[in-house]
Design a protein with these regions (language model features):
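Flexible mid-to-C-terminal extensions adjoining Fe-S/redox cofactors in radical SAM and related proteins
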Residues: 143-220
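Radical SAM enzyme [4Fe-4S]-AdoMet core and its adjacent flexible, acidic
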Residues: 7-139, 143-152
């Protein structure tokens, strides 16, 4: 950090928090100590929406994320990108909805919840093939390069450098372009949507249901 700042870069730290996938009790205490050791340099944390983490946050109101959130730390909820281990970690659409509504009711400043509530328009959460950077670089999902056993977990033939097949499959499935929430919907993770063993309990898009919940709560 000092080296970056000496070069004129305003550098901060971001860390990730995966309570059910990464820590036993002693390691969690070490993690907490490290967070507070670097408190003045901490910009935010990313939390991972796995099945076990969602269950944990829904049942444990005293979790460390709760503490950090209420101390003003920026929190971003990131989607679980499935691989060959995903059958025990990939949440259902109902579990996604349950955690989204829990965050709306209790942690409305967690992104992307905050963006859904506050913004009229949002960028997609995935680095989709429709995004082109200033230097002309076409953005692609960083996880498209998969091992053969991982690629077998998807409905669509995953291309090494081409998001379009999985984007098209999701956008057409829910007819996103006609949705009243399309401009402020971040669409989630296209690879997670394409996971072969994803359990879909709802007949409707979980993001559409979540945006409707936000409106019904009077937050828009």
């Amino acid at each position: 950090l000092k080296a970056c700042r000496d070069m004129g870069c305003n550098s901060k730290l971001v860390t990730s928090y995966d309570p059910r996938g990464r820590f036993n009790k002693p390691n969690l205490e070490i993690f907490k100590e490290n967070v507070y050791d670097f408190w003045d340099d901490l910009e935010g944390i990313g939390v991972l929406l796995t099945k076990s983490n969602i269950k944990y946050w829904l049942t444990d109101p005293k979790d460390f994320m709760h503490e950090l959130y209420h101390k003003g730390v920026k929190v971003y909820a990131d989607y679980y990108m499935p691989d060959c281990q995903a059958e025990r970690s990939m949440p259902t659409d109902k579990e996604h909805y349950d955690i989204f509504t829990h965050f709306i009711d209790n942690y409305p400043k967690i992104d992307p919840i905050r963006s859904w509530i506050e913004n009229e328009r949002n960028v997609v959460s995935c680095r989709s093939s429709k995004l082109v950077l200033e230097d002309g670089t076409m953005c692609l999902c960083g996880n498209l390069v998969q091992e053969p056993r991982d690629k077998a977990m998807y409905k669509t033939d995953i291309q090494k450098a081409n998001n379009k097949p999985i984007e098209k499959a999701f956008l057409e499935k829910y007819n996103c372009s006609t949705c009243e929430y399309f401009h402020r919907c971040t669409l989630g993770c296209f690879m997670a949507h394409d996971y072969k063993y994803a359990e879909e309990i709802f007949d409707e898009c979980v993001y559409k249901m979540t945006h409707r919940y936000i409106e019904n709560q009077g937050l828009r």
